[in-house]
Amino acid sequence: MGDCGAYSYIQADSPPVSNTEIIEYYAQSGFTHGVSVDHINTQQNDSWDDSRRCPSEISSRTEFTHKSAIEFIKLCRKNNVSFQPIGVIQSWGPRSAAGYARELVGNGYAYIGLGGLTMHSTSRIYDIVSEVRSKIPDDVCIHLFGFSRLGSLEAFNGLNITSFDSTSPLIQAFKDDVNNYFS
């Protein structure tokens, strides 16, 4: 899976790469799946469903990510890419995530990814995934970015999560003196 590495530019005003550039990179690298360029939203607040309350930085990051995903799938179609496009969703809560998910599916996505989850509680992540899953068809794949809740996987049974990623095992390999090798 090719990913644009949004955590590496989380403090930047905008991503340093375009969808056109990242599509070319994914194609040249031979990835089977490619992720749209996103801009991580680090905060959640259900009251922001009232757009008058949503801080401009939050709305601009989520809207950038949404528009980027729509552009990404259009460019993928135009370029007849060989990889599976994954549209990223950044949100401020379960309802906004579900709304963006419906729109991406409506634009032709068969695979979506939920980003910006790392810093949220397991119950909050569950609420987001559950709401998204309830609003999209069962055959649409869901990827969870930065999902390091390996001890909580069982709680997510029944939500039909296709995939997840985490750098936690890699970080643990370098930082833990005892539990640093898995076989």
Which residues does each PLM region occupy?
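Non-catalytic, usually N-terminal nucleic-acid engagement modules in DNA/RNA processing proteins
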Residues: 1-77
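Glycine-rich phosphate/ribose-binding loops and adjacent secondary-structure elements
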Residues: 79-183
